[in-house]
Design a protein with these regions (language model features):
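Bacterial N-terminal signal peptides that target proteins for export
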Residues: 2-12
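N-terminal targeting leaders of membrane proteins
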Residues: 24-135, 139-146, 150-158, 258-263, ...
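Outer-membrane beta-barrel proteins
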Residues: 151-157, 205-211, 250-261, 301-307
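Interfacial helix-loop-helix junctions of multi-pass membrane proteins
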Residues: 176-198
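Residues on the lipid-exposed face of transmembrane beta-strands in outer-membrane beta-barrel proteins
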Residues: 202-203, 246-252, 295-301, 336, ...
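Transmembrane beta-strands of outer-membrane beta-barrel proteins
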Residues: 216-218, 267-273, 295
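Transmembrane beta-strands of outer-membrane beta-barrel pores
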Residues: 222-226, 275-279, 301-303
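Residues that define the transmembrane beta-barrel architecture of outer-membrane proteins
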Residues: 240-246, 289-293
Length: 355
């Protein structure tokens, strides 16, 4: 996708509009039983819950536990759903697909009068439109949406397998709608964009199903970059990816929890592998454009928020944690970055400079 705002706009729209979907009544469900974090609070289906049975006569029962996904909050434990498309799951699915239709329609509305066609954008080759940053953006956006939908389906009583299948299918279908819309613009639809969407959706849903979503994560960030003045005179197509960075994160907190070991202060850090491009998207292409990969050590902002009492038992807590799991905060990492064009390594400031 070129003319539209790619994965970032699609994910932002999805998070805002999906917040309107909520079930008709509070339910409870055992979410991710192997994880000891706040997000996994709950008890297995069929457990009556400690809150309902005081240990001794006269003891005040503990308040019921709650779990929120954006603005939908439920009381744990939740009974299994009697059908896959109950009211809550149906609303989330319909809203997700509705977002896809709305985003898909924006391109043809802005640039009407074009017949449908596909283009071969390829993936991460040097001479592609965005050097692969567009595909990384699609991947991360779809992984994030699949993660969100999976959680939403779980708190509406769906099983792990049902949540995996439905979140994967709905996210891929959203990507398909968007590419159909792109196919009716001057830029054309892209099978490579849809492939990146499908891979991201699968990994996002699979990480949630496998219970290791607290170990790996994906972030998209803005990196303010001063581009050369000469680029200001060259027409630009779509997004300027010179101001974006894409991260694959490995979280020490989750690793420690799964190993049943306290990582200590390392809990508040994460190891990231970054991908970024500079100078792409111009027409005609500029010779100075380049691609970089990097290794970073950065702050795990959601884990820091949890340490000060933010959790997913409130709508604002869950929304805040999700926002910082998706958005990479600038200047909270140090790293080294390899430039494929110059074949040189650069220091922590590389994402913010155009070499």
């Amino acid at each position: 996708m070129t003319g539209l705002s790619e994965g970032l706009r699609r994910t932002t729209s999805a998070l805002l509009i999906l917040a309107a979907a909520s079930a008709s009544r509070a339910q409870s469900f055992h979410l991710f039983p192997s994880a000891p974090s706040d997000e996994a609070a709950g008890s297995a289906a069929g457990d009556t819950g400690d809150a309902e049975r005081p240990d001794s006569v006269g003891e005040t029962p503990a308040p019921p536990k709650k779990r929120c996904v954006l603005i939908q909050c439920v009381t744990l434990p939740v009974p299994p759903a009697d059908k896959i498309f109950n009211r809550g799951a149906g609303l989330w699915t319909a809203t997700a697909l509705g977002v896809g239709v709305v985003v898909a329609a924006q391109g043809p509305i802005d640039t009407p009068g074009h017949g449908f066609f596909f283009v071969n954008e390829r993936f991460f080759e040097y001479d592609t439109y965005a050097g692969g940053s567009d595909k990384a953006s699609h991947f991360i956006a779809s992984a994030t949406v699949a993660d969100l939908l999976s959680d939403a389906y779980r708190i509406n009583g769906l099983s792990e397998n049902q949540s995996f299948a439905l979140s994967l299918g709905a996210t891929v279908l959203v990507g398909f709608f968007v590419e159909v819309g792109d196919g009716l613009t001057p830029y054309g639809g892209s099978a490579q964009d849809l492939t990146a969407d499908a891979l991201g959706a699968f990994l996002g849903a699979f990480a949630k199903r496998g219970g290791f979503d607290d170990v790996i994560g994906f972030q998209l960030g803005k990196v303010p970059t001063d581009s050369p003045p000469a680029l200001e005179t060259i027409p630009h197509l779509g997004i300027d990816y010179s101001h974006e960075i894409h991260d694959l994160n490995f979280k020490f907190a989750g690793i420690g929890d799964h190993l049943r070991s306290d990582p200590g202060p390392a809990r508040y850090f994460q190891l990231s592998f970054a991908y970024l491009t500079k100078g792409y998207g111009y027409q005609p292409p500029v010779e100075s454009r380049y691609q970089e990969i990097g290794v970073e050590l950065g702050l795990n902002i959601p884990e820091i928020l949890k340490a000060v009492g933010v959790n997913d038992s409130t709508w604002w807590g869950d929304t805040l944690l999700r926002a910082f799991r998706f958005f990479r905060v600038p200047y909270t990492q140090i790293g080294a970055y390899y430039n494929f064009k110059s074949r040189k390594w650069y220091g922590p400031g590389a994402p913010y400079h155009y070499y």
